[in-house]
Amino acid sequence: MKLQTTYPSNNYPIFVEHGAIDHISTYIDQFDQSFILIDEHVNQYFADKFNDILSYENVHKVIIPAGEKTKTFEQYQETLEYILSHHVTRNTAIIAVGGGATGDFAGFVAATLLRGVHFIQVPTTILAHDSSVGGKVGINSKQGKNLIGAFYRPTAVIYDLDFLKTLPFEQILSGYAEVYKHALLNGESATQDIEQHFKDREILQSLKGMDKYIAKGIETKLDIVVADEKEQGVRKFLNLGHTFGHAVEYYHKIPHGHAVMVGIIYQFIVANALFDSKHDINHYIQYLIQLGYPLDMITDLDFETLYQYMLSDKKNDKQGVQMVLIRQFGDIVVQHVDQLTLQHACEQLKTYFK
């Protein structure tokens, strides 16, 4: 499947298929040099997939740490200095091969190297179906995730579904959170459909039918980011579950998607409190348990610690914390939420696990 962005200009293709990696060679021929920034774990398992590409004299491989460990100033400077030592030009390309963190990092390198060079995303996880599309790139600060970054469109996104076959279950769980988030944004019918399809751990682990839901998730995100590239309006909806989720991820060091799922439940609790919504919290908790999400850490959540992180969320303004909330399916809002409501929601969340 080939999708295409529909901006007024500077559009890019998104290839979503088994064997999509074959498209890379077509692009490499257009660049004077290419630097493949590859996650150390992906390199360990899939190095042979890139042998043909690396046979090109003008292609270099740079192995970087896996996950969020790579999104540091130190790694950023080290990588830039190495690339600059090869006398690059603006017709150089940075190719990100790995999960969402790899794409974030490599994209920020591409955006800032010579004020912008070509950038190709080659996501290898389910989670990265979300982050590889839309142009958000960046690194982390000691103050929180993704606070230093840019909006930078890739030249192409090449999503080879063959990479998913070897994902450990923890990464399947983490990635599924973003797939599920897109279903929630699409409404009650889409949510019921995906819950009925992936109804337990066994089916989720098999990845049966995942291709369809990944493609639908990408289409959902494209519709939103083309309408609001710089996150001034509806693109904020894509942060569903992330205000609280990022805080949980940062302080409890759990996978991104696991934390987002906790954040999704949390926002349902907040929506019930603010709007008298009738979301069935037990339903969502039981669904996550059926899928195998480890939720024991919820009893250890410390609101004061998490709140300090939430205050740094990029959606906030001078009035305080803003959250994306599902008031009702099909009625999504970005809402200021006061500290007391946030605290009560955290306390209520914990009561479900006592």
UniProtKB/Swiss-Prot annotation:
Q: Name one GO cellular component term.
A: cytoplasm
Q: Which InterPro entries match?
A: Dehydroquinate_synthase, DHQ_synth_AroB, DHQ_synth_fam, DHQS/DOIS_N, DHQS_C
Alphabetically, which GO biological process terms does the record hold?
amino acid biosynthetic process; aromatic amino acid family biosynthetic process; chorismate biosynthetic process
Q: Quick one: which pathway? A: Metabolic intermediate biosynthesis; chorismate biosynthesis; chorismate from D-erythrose 4-phosphate and phosphoenolpyruvate: step 2/7
Localization terms from the record: Cytoplasm
Q: How, per the record, is the cofactor bound?
A: Binds 1 divalent metal cation per subunit. Can use either Co(2+) or Zn(2+).
Q: Which residues bind NAD(+)?
A: 39, 45, 68-71, 100-104, 124-125, 136, 145, 163-166
**EC main group:** lyase
EC code(s) of this entry: 4.2.3.4
List residues binding Zn(2+). 178, 242, 256
Q: What Gene Ontology molecular function terms does this protein carry?
A: 3-dehydroquinate synthase activity; metal ion binding; nucleotide binding
Q: Name the cofactor(s) required for activity, per the record.
A: NAD(+); Co(2+); Zn(2+)
Chief localization class?
A: cytoplasm
Q: Which Gene3D superfamilies match?
A: 3.40.50.1970, Dehydroquinate synthase-like - alpha domain (1.20.1090.10)
Known catalysed reaction(s)?
A: 7-phospho-2-dehydro-3-deoxy-D-arabino-heptonate = 3-dehydroquinate + phosphate
Q: Which UniProt keywords apply?
A: Amino-acid biosynthesis, Aromatic amino acid biosynthesis, Cobalt, Cytoplasm, Lyase, Metal-binding, NAD, Nucleotide-binding, Zinc
Tell me which HAMAP family the record gives. Answer: DHQ_synthase
Record-linked NCBIfam families: aroB
Which family is it part of?
Belongs to the sugar phosphate cyclases superfamily. Dehydroquinate synthase family.
Briefly, what is this protein's role? Answer: Catalyzes the conversion of 3-deoxy-D-arabino-heptulosonate 7-phosphate (DAHP) to dehydroquinate (DHQ).
> What protein does this entry describe?
3-dehydroquinate synthase
Q: Cite the source lineage.
A: Bacteria, Bacillati, Bacillota, Bacilli, Bacillales
